[in-house]
């Protein structure tokens, strides 16, 4: 993730280019994402309301926004460098900007960084998960199990991870947490915690190697997305249990297959036994037309006879959803 500069002048320039509407949206805790399409149409996703049209932006104005972000990221935005990725100097929100020729017109998305922590109890009261699922998660935390949260884009993986981390801090306040991320999204109130972030020159695998020298009690990774997954699994297996990570996958079982794919990027050996030993609990969350819900919680009991040994906890009712 490209490092940003947060000089007040750059912040003011970016605020001016975004305009009042988008600045207000970025201050709105219910906003999930702001999207500008190449045709100039704006859309905003809000919790409980889904995606709604929010007006339009001219190509010239969109180019100014992308250029301002690029400047803050100490980069350039032009036809030879048409992709700008990074964190906004306003709030640390995730930004992805695109310019022609890879799109027909300037486009960007802003994934708003969550500002409100949703307690695990709220997931139950709003019927995003069952009481049995919440109990399984709490039991896993108390037993220092490693938890993988799976889901698609926009399913709420990071928000759920923050809720689980808050439970960890409550259950084990003396534990030292080391948190590794590409983008700063994890919220952690632990007194003894260290947050590390990747850069253009330091990748996740390198951060994980450094983490082993930082005396972690629990290792938390914002998202596993490459061969560094193998390094994390080995760390979990060698005296650092009780960790949390997220992974892009639509179901709990497909999360195991995804881990197989990622570990294959770092090793030619099959890693099912390593995965079966390191991963204890998979929490699968999804977003549907009815809202977000925890689809399933699965306990992994190892890998034997060419199969993962699993135990399913109660699934949420089919008609349940979060508002």
UniProtKB/Swiss-Prot annotation:
InterPro entries: Conjug-transfer_TrbB, P-loop_NTPase, T2SS/T4SS_dom, T4SS_GSP_E_ATPase
Primary location recorded for the protein, binned into one broad class: cytoplasm
MF annotations from Gene Ontology: ATP binding; ATP hydrolysis activity
GO cellular component: cytoplasm
Compartment(s) where it occurs, according to its Swiss-Prot or TrEMBL record: Cytoplasm
Domain of life: Bacteria
Sites where the protein binds ATP: 151-158
Keywords from the UniProt entry: ATP-binding, Conjugation, Cytoplasm, Nucleotide-binding, Plasmid, Transport
PANTHER family assigned to the protein according to its UniProt record, in alphabetical order: TWITCHING MOTILITY PROTEIN PILT, TYPE IV PILUS RETRACTATION ATPASE PILT
Record family assignment: Belongs to the GSP E family.
Annotated protein name in UniProt: Conjugal transfer protein TrbB
């Amino acid at each position: 993730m490209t490092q940003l500069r947060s000089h007040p002048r750059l912040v003011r320039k970016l605020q001016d280019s975004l305009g009042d509407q988008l600045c207000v949206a970025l201050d709105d805790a219910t906003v999930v994402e702001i999207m500008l399409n190449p045709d100039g149409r704006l859309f905003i996703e809000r919790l409980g309301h889904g995606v709604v049209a929010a007006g339009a932006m001219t190509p010239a104005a969109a180019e100014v926004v992308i250029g301002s972000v690029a400047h803050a990221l100490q980069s350039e935005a032009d036809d030879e460098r048409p992709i700008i990725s990074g964190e906004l100097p306003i709030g640390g929100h995730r930004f992805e900007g695109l310019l022609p020729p890879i799109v027909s017109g300037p486009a960007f998305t802003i994934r708003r960084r969550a500002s409100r922590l949703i307690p695990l109890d709220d997931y139950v009261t709003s019927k995003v998960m069952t009481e049995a699922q919440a109990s399984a998660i709490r039991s896993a935390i108390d037993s220092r199990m490693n938890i993988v949260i799976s889901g698609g884009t926009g399913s709420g993986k990071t928000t759920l991870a923050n809720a689980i981390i808050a439970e960890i801090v409550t259950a084990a306040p003396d534990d030292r947490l080391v948190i590794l991320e590409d983008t700063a999204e994890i919220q952690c109130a632990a007194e003894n915690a260290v947050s590390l972030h990747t850069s253009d020159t330091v990748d996740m695998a390198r951060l994980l190697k450094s983490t082993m020298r930082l005396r972690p009690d629990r290792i938390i990774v914002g998202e596993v997305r490459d061969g560094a997954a193998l390094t994390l699994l080995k760390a979990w297996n060698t005296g650092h249990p009780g960790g949390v990570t997220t992974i892009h996958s639509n179901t709990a079982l497909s999360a195991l297959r995804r881990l197989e794919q990622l570990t294959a990027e770092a090793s030619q050996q099959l890693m099912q036994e390593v995965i079966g030993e390191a991963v204890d609990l998979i929490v699968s969350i999804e977003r549907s037309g009815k809202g977000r819900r925890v689809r399933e919680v699965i306990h992994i009991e190892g890998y034997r006879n060419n199969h993962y040994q699993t135990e399913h906890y109660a699934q949420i009712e089919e008609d349940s959803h979060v508002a």
